[in-house]
């Protein structure tokens, strides 16, 4: 039992890395203001702001699934975006005369190329974010119909809550079985 628990810890950490903490923090911080505390029944501006916030955060989750980093031969950490040709470096220092890609071997270059798994991870990351967003009471009160528990709206909200729990459980299994090889921007451990 102890060995299986120890083996599951890296998977739990990987799950936390796949949903960008900054994105979740921005969402939880701005949602009460944008949704007027969940009271946007007759205020289309608040609904629009809430939908815009959710869209922006979902796009950030999707985009962050394609970011990676590595340490160059000069000891600096380089951040980039995965492309079909490899990693496109974002923080290059051309004025110092060092080529950050010169330290990458052919097998490392291959590792940083965009793959189908990256798109699957990006899609699942967005689904996880949306499932967590639905769990917010401000989100539900602003955008989902909520009548008494015996009406269709009440059943719909209850179904959404259970659906979110199911999605999060399935995503945690998915991320444990198919861990991401991307480290993202801001992950401090060095390979």
Curated annotation (Swiss-Prot):
Keywords: Kinase, Membrane, Transferase, Transmembrane, Transmembrane helix. It holds the Pfam family DUF679. The keyword Cytoplasm does not apply. The keyword Transferase applies. GO terms for molecular function: kinase activity. It is a multi-pass membrane protein. Its main location: membrane. The chain crosses the membrane at residues 15-35, 48-68, 114-134, 158-178. InterPro entries: DMP. It comes from the Eukaryota. One of its GO terms (cellular component) is cytoplasm. Restricted to flowers. GO terms for biological process: endomembrane system organization. It is found in: Membrane. Involved in membrane remodeling. PANTHER family: PROTEIN DMP10, PROTEIN DMP3. Belongs to the plant DMP1 protein family. This is Protein DMP10. The gene is DMP10.
């Amino acid at each position: 039992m102890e060995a299986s628990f120890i083996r599951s810890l890296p998977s739990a950490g990987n799950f936390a890395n796949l949903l960008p903490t900054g994105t979740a923090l921005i969402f939880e911080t701005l949602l009460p203001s944008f949704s007027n505390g969940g009271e946007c029944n007759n205020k289309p501006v608040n609904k629009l702001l809430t939908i815009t916030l959710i869209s922006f955060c979902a796009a950030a989750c999707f985009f962050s699934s394609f970011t990676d980093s590595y340490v160059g031969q000069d000891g600096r950490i380089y951040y980039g975006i995965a492309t079909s040709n490899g990693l496109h470096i974002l923080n290059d220092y051309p004025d110092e005369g060092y080529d950050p890609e010169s330290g990458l071997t052919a097998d490392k270059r291959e590792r940083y190329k965009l793959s189908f798994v990256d798109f699957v991870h990006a899609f699942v990351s967005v689904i996880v974010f949306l499932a967590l967003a639905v769990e917010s009471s401000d989100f539900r009160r602003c955008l989902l119909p909520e009548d008494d528990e015996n009406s269709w709206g009440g059943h719909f909200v209850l179904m959404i809550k259970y659906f979110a729990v199911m999605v999060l459980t399935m995503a945690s299994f998915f991320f444990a079985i198919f861990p991401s090889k991307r480290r993202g921007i801001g992950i401090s451990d060095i390979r």
